[in-house]
Amino acid sequence: MTDRSRRVHDDSIIIDGAFTNFSVPIPPTESVPDMMLDHIIDGGVTAVCHSLIADPFPMSAEEALMTLYDESIVFDAFPDKTVQILTAQDIEDAKAAGKLGIIFATQGMASIGTNMRYIWVYHKLGVRVMQLTYNERSALGCGCKEPVDTGLTRFGEQAVEQMNALGIVLDLSHCGVRTSLEAIAHSQAPAIFSHASVRALNG
């Protein structure tokens, strides 16, 4: 790496948009998670979107809430290395402090069922990025593997509105094209594709 490249890297805010391989044992121990944190921080990563709830591993809302609680242990276990990201300013503060910012995220929203209140509860527990669907059709819209994308449902529209109101970032990775475009059109805030490829390059 050239000196200029190193300076750009060191000065940049770098966010891993789909991090899924971190967990802290209960009770916490100074072992693999500690080593992983060191590698990530040494690599210059500012923050990671930690996908705690993912539709490929189905869980009830109760199980999802317990997962959020359990994963919060990381902040108590490694207070000198981690900080929970709740606002954009927290990301800048993590960069300045040399700590790893952890953004709680979901890949899919099947765990909320058809109960909009869980979005509010997840937000209270620190979730700041929520992915609308995961590959398949849900109560909110269609995933990218559905042969026919019927678009954003009315419940999906309400979910987007709730996320906008709470300040949760709308993630459209794994979503179908029509569902994604309709969600973008309906949202009052920017959406992201935290982990996706460019169709023109990847077919």
Predicted regions and their residues:
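N-terminal hydrophobic targeting/anchoring segments and the immediately downstream early-domain regions
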Residues: M1-D149, R154, R199-G203
